[in-house]
Regions:
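Conserved SAM/SAH-binding loop-helix junction
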Residues: 14
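Glycine-rich FAD pyrophosphate-binding loop
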Residues: 6, 20-40
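Beta1/beta-strand and adjacent pyrophosphate-binding region of the FAD-binding site
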Residues: 1-11
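Adenine-nucleotide cofactor-binding loop residues
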Residues: 11, 32, 126
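Conserved N-terminal helical subregion
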Residues: 1-3, 20-22, 45-142
Length: 142
């Protein structure tokens, strides 16, 4: 089956990964001209960690992540007001925890499927029309 996924963030490439394994032809479409950089730091643990491990990506995600040792609360003046040692998270998750930039997670998943999917950057899905033989997808730029 041919499948179009709109968005190359985290969910789009992750879905593309599993659909490709299932034998589907995947087209990823991203409005940005390239993979996005930056973004916020996410705490990576629990089911997301388990899935990345199943995908064979957890080593790279941990390498790119920050092994945070302390969480600090600071005032407007920049002085520490409180905080705690985050080793409690390590104990609670059996050391299956890292903090990693969102764009690094996205890029790691995308690299795992690059060459196995078709990716279009700088465009987005404009519409879809059901046809007798399937769906017709139109794009903003193409």
């Amino acid at each position: 089956m041919k499948i179009v996924i709109n968005g190359i963030g985290i969910a789009g490439p992750a879905l593309g990964y599993w659909l490709t394994i299932a034998g589907h032809a995947v087209l990823l479409v991203e409005e940005a001209p390239r993979l996005r950089a930056g973004g916020y730091i996410i705490d990576f643990w629990g089911i997301g960690y388990d899935i990345a491990e199943e995908m064979g990506l957890i080593g790279e995600i941990r390498r790119l992540g920050y092994q945070v040792r302390e969480l600090r609360f600071v005032g407007r003046d920049g002085r520490k007001r409180g905080g705690f040692d985050v080793t409690v998270f390590g104990r609670m998750t059996h050391d299956r925890f890292t903090s990693v930039p969102r764009s690094d997670v996205s890029a790691t998943i995308y690299r795992a499927i690059e060459g196995k999917v078709v990716a279009i950057f700088g465009d987005s899905v404009a519409g879809m029309d059901e046809q007798e033989q399937g769906w017709r997808v139109t794009f903003d730029q193409a």
